[in-house]
Amino acid sequence: MLFAIVSYDKPDALERRLAARPKHLVWLEAAGPQLRYVGPLLDEEGKQRGSIVVTEQPDLEAARAFARADPFWGADVFATQTVHAFREVFRDGARVA
């Protein structure tokens, strides 16, 4: 089942984000095939303000555990983080569901 993890940074999190980024990238690489989409959320000036991760997990509990394992969470980067079930309807311009 797909889940969207939507996380918003704390206003003062940039230094912590940069420090934790190498561990965050290793965590993402280790997740490999579980990941569908990953990327930063940007503000009007193009600065990072959070992130979205769409991941394949067996259930909501597993998706929440996966989200909490993100090194950005442990580094106190995020102000909020929500996990939602997600259904992919279009991919690369083609309907898939």
Language-model features: locations:
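Conserved, structured core segments of small domains
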Residues: 1-97
